[in-house]
Regions:
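Non-heme di-metal
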Residues: 1-180
């Protein structure tokens, strides 16, 4: 959607499908962050993002279960493109050499947008089970936001440094061709 999401026009199925896409995209992004940043032990950025990805997977499963029980195999009308108004950062924001700080900032931004999605959707969702699920997910987004704010506040200055390509040598002459 190129304009702001109009919640009044969403069906219950659309809301569930958007929620599912939000969680799937977040999981994939957090796995990408974890892979890019690496894991050196409990509590480092890679481990935090792996844990967040696991949490998003659980959210996906809860939403999928609810959707299946209500709508069966009915085809979704929303697509991955529709979530960029809701949670996902711009595609260019996620880079291979992202700094720890930037990764956490993007995660915070995404979690804040996810909170806003669930919070606003609650004004339109009337089905009791889905309303309860969205309230639970909104509350979890609040926890994620609070956690990320604390992590960011305690990051060392070095967290601002972007990753470097260890194979890159600025003193090695460039080659025009790799032919022998």
């Amino acid at each position: 959607m190129s304009t702001r999401l109009d919640f009044s026009k969403l069906t219950l199925m659309d809301a569930l499908d958007l929620a599912s896409l939000i969680e799937i995209e977040a999981r994939n992004r957090y796995l990408e962050f974890a892979e890019s940043l690496g894991t050196r032990g409990d509590g480092d950025a890679g481990a935090v993002f792996r844990s967040m990805a696991e949490n998003e997977t659980k959210h996906c499963e809860e939403i999928a279960e609810r959707r299946l029980s209500l709508f069966g195999d009915e085809e979704a009308r929303v697509t991955l493109d529709d979530i960029f108004d809701v949670e996902a950062p711009e595609m260019g924001d996620v880079r291979w050499n992202i700094s720890v700080l930037k990764a956490y900032q993007l995660a915070l931004y995404s979690e804040q947008k996810a909170f806003a999605f669930y919070d606003e959707a609650l004004d339109y969702v009337t089905q009791p089970d889905v309303k309860a699920l969205f309230q639970e997910l909104r509350d979890e987004e609040t926890q994620h936001v609070n956690m990320l704010v604390k992590i960011i506040a305690n990051l060392p200055k070095s967290a601002e440094i972007e990753l470097e390509d260890e194979d890159y040598d600025p003193n090695r002459p460039a080659r025009d061709s790799f032919e022998a």
